[in-house]
From Swiss-Prot:
Keyword rRNA-binding among record annotations: yes
Key word Chaperone present: no
Protein name (database record): Large ribosomal subunit protein uL23
InterPro entries associated with the record: Nucleotide-bd_a/b_plait_sf, Ribosomal_uL23-like, Ribosomal_uL23/eL15/eS24_sf
Organism: Wigglesworthia glossinidia brevipalpis
GO cellular component assignments: ribonucleoprotein complex; ribosome
Family designation: Belongs to the universal ribosomal protein uL23 family.
Highest taxon of source: Bacteria
Gene3D superfamilies xref list: 3.30.70.330
Function of the protein: One of the early assembly proteins it binds 23S rRNA. One of the proteins that surrounds the polypeptide exit tunnel on the outside of the ribosome. Forms the main docking site for trigger factor binding to the ribosome.
Amino acid sequence: MINKKENIFKILTSSYSSEKSSILSEKNNTFTFKVLKNSKKSEIKSSIEKFFNVKVKKVRTVMLKGKSKKHKNIIGKRKNWKKAYVVLKKNQKINLIKNIE
């Protein structure tokens, strides 16, 4: 479990963008993040509320297996990772892409 004084950036590794996640963000106010494998839903919820200053309605997590990759005769494997779907309450928004002028 992450201590309160530790940085919230340790739980949220990055935002995740795909066709499915963009559709969910437009229709259901759901955002997708890559998180630490051992993080809990309550930790994810509190870190997003503190970092983005929004109210979270629900958090769903999925554990994804790393893909097997082959380069010439060497077979390798990517790391397993955890994805979190974060549903925000009504009238709450996260601006992941800031305008660059």
